[in-house]
């Protein structure tokens, strides 16, 4: 039996899943602590839209366009997007993004099941055999050095890893990770694409 078609499918439109990540201009230490994420400033934000089939890179000047794309999405998928990326973006808008965007935060979902956090690199490396190409501190250093292209490449790769982890989990109903003893484990997920 085939599942019923969604309103979008009946209208001939595909569901728009928007994969999202951003990098910041400043560290938590620079702004006085992790409770001041809204002061970190976005250096670049990157999305991948399944409806458009393309990546988009947003500078700080285009943050309103980024927010609008997230609000219009049928689903926003990110890794630590609720407690980090949205908090940074809320330094630019009065909108309550965690409550106004339909969101699947892969890290939060995994944490609920395991009782502890995993990083994107741990899940992507074990599930896909590919790891991250840097970290947020690299991106901040590149920002200070004016190396915006490196930030864009790094952030695009993180968005791609997030997309591939989501698709892997949706297909296999689990994702893999290596625990602190380097033992390969898996965690069941109920994600859909």
Region spans (language model):
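Conserved RNase H-like, two-metal-ion catalytic cores of nucleic-acid enzymes
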Residues: 2-71, 75
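Short, motif-level signal for alpha-helix interfacial/capping segments enriched in acidic residues
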Residues: 2-3, 82-84, 136-137
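Acidic active-site catalytic centers that drive phospho-/nucleotidyl reactions
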Residues: 21-23, 105, 158
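Conserved DEDDh/DEDDy metal-dependent 3′-5′ exonuclease domain
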Residues: 50-122
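A polyampholytic, Gly/Pro-enriched intrinsically disordered region
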Residues: 117-133
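Acidic, Mg2+-coordinating catalytic module of metal-dependent nucleases/exonucleases
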Residues: 128-187
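Short, amphipathic C-terminal "tail helix"
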Residues: 188-193
